[in-house]
A protein has these predicted regions:
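Nucleotide-activated sugar donor-binding and catalytic core shared by glycosyltransferases
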Residues: 1-248, 258-396
């Protein structure tokens, strides 16, 4: 029997230990990864409930990262995934509203642009201060569902925490209050630094039979690349030609939706393209830092490229998209936007690899190097709960 959304939260309670009561909402692998250090830091200083919407329900997209990143299991699983997108979004809002109404947190914290972030709609209706990390990111591509979510969550949030000055300017252009917008930087450097010894110690190459520097790492899962027929065929024809051209394994960290799409289409991948279940945090990053090239549509690619360059492990980073919400990483030359057609993708891989061989690496993005982002977030949340209650909601 399929899980049903959880609407009864009578069993969920804060510890009531006198600390600020904060609910952190997650739902996908990227949120769990980026928030790892923030969640652990908040648990030290606040009374925290971690709520998981269930948007990513596969263990390899979810549970393995709690283990790798030394995170306690969420106090709440909403099981909000519905039969279609409308049902899922509706369940996320409904479940979150009921959770917030029952537990009465002092604040709600979300990160990014996933459907799980729509939980803040319930918090807004209940006059609960909302804190949004990764605010102000824009790629200006209306085909991306995340772009809609970004606008909604930025506008609803009471305090927006941006990664960069680019993002802060976007927020200002939207008319959002400058006095409640801060640049914290990306939380990824802190997470990667905290896990660097485990990343370097991973035996993933031995387990998978791969030789360092002689494989291409592939990650392709975005809706616009997988669900759109034209883009899907263009991308995977290019991947097959890449395998033929470089004559080396292409390890494809393949999400369930991508695997299902490939199976349903009957598309024949080159034998050198190896489909693998999504990899854990330590294994994936060990593979990145030792790859001939990394070809990915992941939003964290620019941040990971910047970090590994800063610690002496640069890799050729190629983004299989036509836009980016991280222009600050383009400013510093940390990755190449390749598009998804065969010619431009192969040219981009060639260029990135040759530049790396010549020692022409990008420069670490200043907004991506701070390793105290979790501390900044704790101080901002503690500072602004009272201010929002007084200045926005007139509670006292």
């Amino acid at each position: 029997m399929e899980k049903q959304p959880k609407f009864d939260y009578s069993d969920i309670k804060f510890k009531d230990n006198g600390k600020l009561k904060l609910i952190i909402v997650v739902g996908t692998r990227p949120e769990i990864i980026r928030l790892a250090a923030v969640i652990n830091k908040c648990r030290l200083y606040f009374d925290v409930i971690l709520a998981h919407t269930g948007q990513n329900y596969d263990y390899n997209l979810n549970g393995i990262f709690f283990k790798d990143l030394k995170l306690a299991e969420p106090e709440v699983y909403m099981d909000a995934v519905g039969d279609d997108l409308g049902a899922t979004c509706g369940n996320i809002i409904n479940c979150s509203y009921k959770l917030f109404a029952k537990t009465k947190p002092d604040g709600v914290l979300v990160l990014g642009d996933t459907n799980s972030c729509l939980s803040v709609i319930g918090a807004k209706r209940l006059h609960i201060p909302i804190f949004h990390m990764e605010a102000g990111n824009r790629c200006k591509d209306e085909c991306l569902p995340e772009e809609t979510n970004r606008r909604i969550v930025d506008i609803i949030s009471d305090v927006n925490m941006a990664y960069s000055e680019h993002a802060r300017r976007y927020l200002a252009d939207c008319g959002l209050p400058k006095e409640r917008t801060y640049v914290t930087g990306s939380p990824m450097a802190e997470v990667l630094h905290n896990n660097l010894s485990e990343i370097e110690a991973s035996d993933v190459h031995q387990r998978l039979g791969l030789e360092k520097g002689k494989y291409i790492l592939l990650s392709a899962h975005r809706e616009e690349n997988i669900d759109t027929e034209k883009n899907f065929l263009s991308l995977f024809n290019a991947i097959n030609h890449m395998a033929e051209k470089y004559d080396m394994p292409i390890l494809y960290s393949c999400h369930p939706r991508s695997r299902n799409r490939l199976a349903a289409s009957g598309f024949q991948l080159d034998p050198r393209v190896i489909q693998h279940e999504p990899l854990g945090f330590h294994d994936y990053n060990c593979l990145q830092m030792n790859a001939f090239a990394v070809v990915s549509d992941s939003g964290t690619l620019p941040e990971e490229s910047s970090f590994f360059t800063s610690v002496g492990h640069p890799f050729p980073a190629i983004c299989i998209r036509t836009s980016t919400e991280r222009p600050e990483a383009i400013d510093k030359g940390d990755f190449i936007i390749a598009g998804i057609d065969e010619k431009s993708l192969l040219q981009a891989v060639d260029t990135a690899v040759e530049l790396c061989k010549d020692g022409q690496h990008g420069i670490p993005v200043p907004d991506y190097v701070d390793e105290n982002v979790s501390t900044k977030v704790v101080k901002i949340v503690q500072s602004y709960v009272g201010i929002i209650n007084k200045m926005v909601w007139r509670k006292f």
